[in-house]
Amino acid sequence: MANLPSCEDYEVSINVPRLIKCPKLSCGHVEKNALGTTINYVGGFCIVFPFYKSDGKKIAVRCWIASVDKAQERTRKIAEELKKVNLPYFVNFEYEQEGIATNSGVQPIVLMDWIAAKSLKDYIKDNLTKPDILRKLATSFKTMAIDLHKANISHGDLQHGNILIRDDGSLVLVDYDSMFVPSLAGFKDEIKGLAGYQHPARWNNENITAKADYFSELIIYTSIMALSYFPSLWAELKIENTETLLFSADDIKSGGTTAIFRKLDSHPELKNLSDAIKKSLRYNSIDDLQPLEEAIISDSERIMGKIRVKWGKRPVEKQEYCPDTTNTRAKWNRAN
């Protein structure tokens, strides 16, 4: 997909019915705001247009603005795998080769179900004064991570813009261009994600892998937990206006020596998470990283776990003795 159209090119074309070549979009229309401006959302590789089909159903139309190697094959294999594993965190999507005509020719597009949900940042912002809800969110996020690990799947670009939360608190992932599924083993790792979420070794990683999310999972989980204890960090770090959550690219490059790590180290419930990030940053390859559910186990918990495995639920078998107080009392009374 060389010489791809610009965002402006796509915006012009999607507003001209005869330039929309995909039959599934026939007689539909792109969404506009009150001023008549076309609504769109731009990422590093795609521009997304909210679109209403002829039956009134709202979908997302994703158009590439940067090349992704073997995009069609990737999309097909990802769709096949997601149907197979049937996890609740993904939406239906279809690759359409004949999508939209532009000055650069007819471009392929991806059609996805539109999800009525809040972005991760919006959800956190709305619940900053509700620590229990944020901790429940962190637990749900960890559960999702475990489910992905069991399926041998990684999203590849976990960050605030690609994680949505429905009203019931359930999580949805969007933007699948960077995903790993087993049938894509050996494909190039081209979409690396945002700097505030990625391990330094990710930038030199060659092929997509099931381990691509391990570090970003730890960053996101820690950020949510930290904000549940220190909601003031939201304003102090101006999180709403950044492309990060709790950690900046400089924080990650520091290896764990910046102020945010010292803040986490000061809280007994967060120090273990801070230590886990620092430990991860000592590795030179993402292949050496641990999944979230293992990374957040403290060293002491890990040791106790090994003891329990070896000795059972009770690490030390203790012989208990309860004296027969009734007989003792009777003997004492007779003696007196």
Features from the language model and the residues they span:
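ATP-binding glycine-rich loop module of kinase domains
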Residues: 36-38, 44-92
